[in-house]
């Protein structure tokens, strides 16, 4: 049986890693061993970041809703409780968008929440 030489596969693997390491500084871009570690770590950070992004946006929406609710004389928790009792099922993303781009519409929602909480 003929001897198998793995030069082609190795070169392909090295090129793939080094192309993923484009934009890195010094040995992290040029040396395969270092570049491989840098790419693996970067992919870990990217994976973690995709999870953190969801949490960060949710907290941003809550901050925006809370600020708009307090302008209308309600706390965030009482505002959300009022909406729940009214049967309004808008999610936080939409509520935050309404708070930023349509303050009058948000005020109407806040008034509905206030009226149901007062009753």
UniProtKB/Swiss-Prot annotation:
Q: Which PROSITE patterns match?
A: RIBOSOMAL_L20 (PS00937)
Q: State whether keyword Transcription applies.
A: no
State the Gene Ontology terms under molecular function: rRNA binding; structural constituent of ribosome
Per UniProt, the keywords (alphabetical) are: Ribonucleoprotein, Ribosomal protein, RNA-binding, rRNA-binding
Q: Which GO terms describe its biological process?
A: ribosomal large subunit assembly; translation
This protein's GO cellular component annotations are: ribonucleoprotein complex; ribosome
Check the record and name the NCBIfam families matching this protein. rplT_bact (TIGR01032)
**HAMAP family, alphabetically?**
Ribosomal_bL20 (MF_00382)
Q: What is the recorded function of this protein according to its Swiss-Prot or TrEMBL entry?
A: Binds directly to 23S ribosomal RNA and is necessary for the in vitro assembly process of the 50S ribosomal subunit. It is not involved in the protein synthesizing functions of that subunit.
Similarity-based family: Belongs to the bacterial ribosomal protein bL20 family.
Q: What is this protein called?
A: Large ribosomal subunit protein bL20
Query: Could you tell me the gene encoding this protein?
Result: rplT
